Amino acid sequence: MECTNNPQPRTPWNKGKFVGQKAPFKPKEVWAIRARLQMENRGRELALFDLGIDSKLRACDLVKLRVRDVCHGDRVASRGSVLQQKTQRPVKFEISPGTREAVEAWVRKAGLRSDDYLFPSRVRRSPHLGTRQYARILEGWVSLVGLDPAGYGTHSMRRTKASLIYRRTENLRAVQLLLGHAKLESTVRYLGIEVDDALELAEQTDV
């Protein structure tokens, strides 16, 4: 009997599910974490935190950034671009002056070259920081400023600036492009917009 061994197409793990519902950071929480990292001279983590907030990249893309993805020569560019692992679509991101300063300081301190991973792993078996390592580092940041780690995750980093941009502009298309989503509905679900708006209406209604 002939046996075929054609693998079935994989269904995305998050198909039909609400993902990314870990809370985004509030501006005051971003400032608090940044201040603590600066005070404690944790240059690697400061660069990782600031770039994570600015880039809005998924954890799997953030940890695989190479120096050349954000640097032109010995200077960090004002914009970066990366091919997303999940969608194989390119996405561009801005790099704010404060983040450029933090990343430049980290690159100099670590002696990184253009082809090096921006955040090398301290574990020998991996050339770059892993997503689990990143999640543990983030948990430390959350605890550092007295927040509950259960309420935050790597998607909190990705959602923070995207949520602020939407709240200030209500421009969903812009946020979709910044997050690299193929469909606008994905952005709506990711930000939890319909749920948040419904709750706000409910809170404003007395009976």
What kind of region is each of these model predictions?
Residues 1-207:
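Conserved catalytic core of the tyrosine transesterase superfamily
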